[in-house]
Amino acid sequence: MIENVSVCDLKMSKDLEEIENEIFTTAWPSETIKQKINNKEFKYWVYKKNDKLVAYLGVQFINDFIEILGIGVIEEYRKNGIAGELMNELLDFFNKSSYLKIILEVRESNDTAKNLYTKLGFNKISKRKNYYKNED
């Protein structure tokens, strides 16, 4: 079940922080997430399973494009198409919007994410050297 996080869902900021801490080496603190949820320039989609938050997708709106800030699925729910479902929600939103493009950053070693983005029609346009800490 996919839900849109809105201002009234600030209680989810702690859950989003926990998911980020589980998945990523550097995570946004819950206060930063709260600020983003309260800001119309950001949007979060969350995926719940049995009322448990198991995945999210966060974006920022910048001028005429959407930047994917993060997408994550907790380990026990991976390989079930959840990230793809969240991305399809974003693509549906994008197709109904006036935004011109979607951009994202992905770690060079993250083949799973790169495969998903390629499958969804994203193209590599450039590479930022030394963007990620501890890149392998």
Regions found by a protein language model. Give the residues of each.
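Conserved GNAT acetyl-CoA-binding A-motif
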Residues: 94-105
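Acyl-donor (CoA/ACP) binding surface of acyl/acetyltransferases
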Residues: 76-80, 84, 102, 128-129
